[in-house]
A protein has these predicted regions:
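Cytosolic regulatory regions built on CNB/CRP/Popeye-like sensor folds
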Residues: 1-136
């Protein structure tokens, strides 16, 4: 297992509290991708095919064609669709070059099934986003 990938994952806030052994398992599942400016990663109303963790660069998040957020290194998106297999609640487009860690639905499910800490981190992050969307 390349230590480089584990080290990169260890710097992502989502993986805080995850042991090195658990990180090694997650690292064995993930893919790393380089994305071009203007690339649509998730389309509102369409099935979500992947979970993304940004390593560098930024993405714009829109809902109903209106900007709602800008995400950067350490941020992640696509988790809701990974959990419920429903359609995306927003569109996400790269705003310049982006380096990201990507997990397919199967990879994501395997990662959270094997790691209670990671599952709790994802749930906590989802709750935080729901509160932010509700304005509370």
């Amino acid at each position: 297992m390349p230590d480089k990938k584990v080290d990169r994952l260890s710097r992502v806030p989502l993986f805080a509290g995850v042991s090195r052994r658990e990180l090694e398992f997650v690292a064995s599942l993930v893919d790393e991708v380089s994305l071009k400016p203007g690339q649509t990663l998730i389309t509102e109303g369409q099935p979500t095919e992947a979970f993304f963790i940004l390593e560098s660069g930024h993405v714009e998040v829109t809902r109903g064609g209106k900007p709602v957020n800008r995400l950067g290194p350490g941020d992640f998106f696509g988790e809701i669709g990974m959990l419920d297999r429903g359609t995306a609640t927003a569109t996400v487009v790269t705003d310049g070059p982006v380096e990201a860690i990507v997990l397919s639905h199967t990879q994501f499910r395997d990662a959270i099934k094997a790691n209670d800490n990671l599952a709790l981190q994802v749930i906590a992050a989802m709750a935080k986003r729901l509160r932010a969307d509700a304005g509370t």
